[in-house]
């Protein structure tokens, strides 16, 4: 029994150390930019040696990937919270759309000098976010399936609609971040318009 406890404690220590590196790296990337941050900078700011850092990450690119992954996990957790809310499927879809867009914007803005890297190195971001994309499609699939079962949505292919929804939102990320969607219009005012558009596409039963 004592042996199991030690293994769990060691595992927690490893996880905590790795997460500390990720947190510190994100802050350094946000402040100085990816190019101006070295592995040595990350190790020193973490209060650890370079050897310890290289135990967890082979390169700065790997650390950067971990930072993106962590940010996507934050977004995924928030979407999961919304998915668990007790509300009608059509309302939940709108809430998921705005939660996704607002969280993406908050993440990019919060990361300062790292934001340019998000757009410059889009292929690395795409590689890291693959699992997140798949999970979000599955989340939409479940909400659409519930709406179809209750008669609120007239959907022939739930899987296809879930996939289309995900990629439509993904395509709106950059213009939303830069405020190019509905200039001068508040989110409160856009929600009814977005809802009307989405409900029409889903064949919402009245």
Q: What name fits each language-model region?
A:
Residues 1-5, 138-150, 163, 167-206:
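C-terminal peripheral helix-coil segments that are non-catalytic and often amphipathic
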Residues 2, 20, 24, 28-62, ...:
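Helix-turn-helix
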Residues 10, 154, 158-162:
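Membrane-interface starts of transmembrane alpha-helices
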Residues 66, 80-106, 161-165, 188-191:
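Hydrophobic alpha-helical connector segments
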Residues 69-75:
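Short, basic, alpha-helical segments at the C-terminal edge of helix-turn-helix-like DNA-binding modules
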Residues 82, 111-118, 176-180:
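Secondary-structure edge/capping motif, primarily at the C-terminal ends of alpha-helices
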Residues 101-141:
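Short secondary-structure transition hinges
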């Amino acid at each position: 029994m004592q042996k199991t406890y030690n293994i769990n404690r060691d595992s927690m220590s490893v996880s905590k150390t790795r997460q500390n590196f990720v947190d510190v790296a994100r802050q350094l990337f946000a402040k100085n930019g990816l190019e101006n941050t070295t592995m040595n900078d990350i190790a020193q700011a973490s209060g650890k040696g370079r050897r310890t850092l290289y135990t967890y990450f082979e390169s700065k690119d790997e650390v950067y990937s971990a930072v993106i992954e962590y940010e996507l996990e934050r977004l995924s957790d928030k979407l999961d919270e919304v998915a668990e809310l007790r509300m009608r499927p059509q309302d939940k879809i709108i809430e998921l759309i705005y939660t996704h867009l607002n969280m993406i914007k908050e993440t990019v803005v919060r990361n300062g000098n790292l934001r340019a890297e998000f757009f410059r190195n889009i292929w690395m971001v795409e590689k890291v976010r693959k699992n997140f994309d798949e999970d979000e499609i599955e989340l939409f699939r479940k909400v659409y399936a519930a709406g179809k079962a209750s008669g609120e949505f007239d959907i022939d292919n739930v899987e296809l609609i879930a996939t289309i929804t995900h990629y439509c939102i993904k395509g709106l990320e950059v213009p939303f971040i830069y405020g190019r969607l509905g200039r001068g219009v508040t989110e409160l005012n856009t929600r009814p318009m977005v809802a009307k558009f989405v409900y029409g596409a889903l064949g919402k039963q009245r």
